[in-house]
A protein has these predicted regions:
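Active-site/ligand-binding neighborhood in enzyme catalytic cores
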Residues: 109-218, 225, 409-424
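Short loop/edge segments at beta-strand edges and connector loops
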Residues: 62, 224-226
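N-terminal glycine-rich phosphate/pyrophosphate-binding loop and immediately adjacent elements
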Residues: 1-113
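A conserved FAD-binding loop/helix module that cradles the flavin
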Residues: 33, 446-469
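Active-site-proximal substrate-binding core of FAD-dependent oxidoreductases
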Residues: 233, 469-481
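Mid-domain catalytic core of redox enzymes
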Residues: 199, 229-342
């Protein structure tokens, strides 16, 4: 679009990185997108997806429920994607918390038109751009002042109802839920209400392939099975890359969308680091890696709720994953995407956060590693069979991915798939896309965008292109196919 000849070197055999799916015995396990921010017009990310050819002709599912959280005594919190319905449900569940519930619903409504500035990179802002952004944010200052440093756990403590207090902290279906920024939750539910954050039918890999197709159509080149070992540097200027096979490829500019730690400390030998950059990797928390259990089941689950992120419920018999006992499990039924399994069959997913070091050590003994994955699959199937009698006999496919799986395919530090952990501290943190003392080198992706996600990683790459265009005194151009 902007006159640059580019080529991508990818260590995997397919596009997408963490935005991926994989096939197992006639089933497709989706490993990434629960929803896509900007899935329909009216949301600021939508034009960006249009530029990439990612949304044209694509069907999106807008769920009625974001999540379900069940209690031990039969209580159920349904996080409806419709704000009015969510408010009514919460009031029925805990009428004594009327004031707090109404405040919560009001805060979601207040974020419906929140403007996410994605059209222009902050690094190329001029004075007028800054004034324009400030004026757009002005109506939201009171919300940011009130909730900017508040976590879901902080807000949950205001509920009198004990079940609601517990369930609210699990409503984002993350085990670090209590520490999740309340603002991020408010914005997400506002998008859900406006139906601008749907699930892309076909799954994550097909979504990534549409972007690959757009890139190739524009003349780009992609080299798969091409792991970069070193960034070539001459006189403090990036001049190309050396692959693991020893071949070298020269260039005027190098952009790394690879793992941040690997890029900085291995590919560049840690030579271009200051205290700020070092501090990120020494002190910032990384999102916990996961054990991802995918099952192919000859069952339609027609009576099971279709949700964005799954149903979280207590277990009669705890499951031990990564050496830690779990008394709850979150399960997602993908019967809303007919492309992932044949008619009457369903992909079922259970995901657990875990400890990287546990799996790294276990991986050194292949037999024990394999046996542990089988044991976890057995326990998940048994737990599901207690909830859905007869399910165990209907399981046709089992697949367990661990942090070592994610590390092997993506190179991500500690096997994480989200990068930096999203928190009230990192939510508004900005990281430089360059390294001190190194010219013609840029970084893009989740390691320079705290909180991760496909939209922010995509925006990151677009922003780097704008930065380069400004450096080269060119007008940035973005077209739609």
């Amino acid at each position: 679009m902007n006159g640059y000849r580019t080529q991508i070197f990818e260590m995997d055999t397919k596009p997408g990185g963490c935005c991926t799916s994989w096939d197992r015995r006639g089933y497709t396990i989706d490993g990434c997108l629960h929803w896509l921010t900007g899935s329909s017009p009216g949301q600021s990310f939508y034009p960006i997806w249009e530029e990439l050819g990612a949304v044209q002709g694509r069907t999106f599912v807008n769920h009625e429920e974001y999540a379900r959280i069940e209690g031990k005594e039969g209580q159920v919190l349904i996080v409806y994607t419709d704000i009015n319905r969510l408010e009514r449900h919460m009031l029925e569940l805990a009428p004594e918390d009327k004031d707090v519930i109404e405040e919560f619903a009001k805060a979601i409504r207040a974020m419906i038109d929140f403007p996410i500035p994605v059209e222009k990179a902050p690094e190329v802002f001029g004075p007028i751009d800054r004034l324009r952004i400030m004026s757009r944010f002005l109506p939201y200052l009171s919300i940011f002042r009130k909730y900017g440093k508040m976590t879901i756990g902080d807000f949950a403590m205001r509920f009198k109802d004990p079940f609601l207090r517990l369930a609210f902290t699990r409503s984002v279906n993350l085990e670090n839920g209590p520490d999740f920024p309340l603002l991020a939750m408010l914005i997400t539910l506002a998008w859900m209400d406006q139906r601008t954050a749907g699930y892309p039918v076909g799954g994550s890999l097909e979504f990534a392939r549409s972007i690959e197709g757009r890139y190739l159509a524009l003349g780009g080149q992609v080299h798969y099975r091409s792991k970069v070992a070193k960034v070539l540097v001459e006189n403090d200027r990036a001049v190309g890359v050396r692959l693991a096979d020893g071949s070298e490829h020269r260039s005027d500019i190098v952009i790394s969308a690879a793992d941040g730690r690997t890029t900085i400390f291995d590919m560049l030998d840690g030579k271009y680091v200051n205290g700020k950059v070092q501090g990120y990797y020494d002190r910032l928390p990384v999102a916990d890696p996961v054990v991802y259990v995918g099952l192919g089941v000859a069952r339609s689950f027609e009576d099971s709720p279709r949700t964005v992120t799954g149903t979280d419920y207590p277990l009669d018999v705890p499951i031990i994953v990564g050496g830690r006992e779990r008394d709850r499990m979150t399960v997602q039924w993908y019967n809303f995407d007919p492309t992932l399994a044949t008619e009457g069959k369903t992909v079922v997913k259970a995901m657990f956060t875990t400890n990287y070091e546990y799996w790294k050590k276990l991986k050194q003994d292949p037999e024990r590693y394999k046996a542990e994955k089988e044991r976890i699959a057995d326990m998940v199937v048994a737990a599901l069979d207690r909830r859905f009698p007869g399910l165990a006999a209907q399981v046709e496919m089992r697949d367990v991915a661990t942090p070592m799986t994610f590390e092997r395919y993506t190179g991500n530090w500690q096997g994480t798939f989200l990068g930096w952990l999203i928190s009230t501290k990192t939510l508004r943190m900005r990281m430089s896309k360059t390294l001190p003392g190194l010219k013609d080198f840029y970084m893009a992706g989740q390691w320079v965008e705290p909180g991760g996600s496909v939209p922010t990683a995509t925006m990151s790459g677009r922003n780097v292109t704008q930065i380069i265009c400004k450096r080269d005194k060119k007008d940035f151009v973005a077209t739609k196919p």
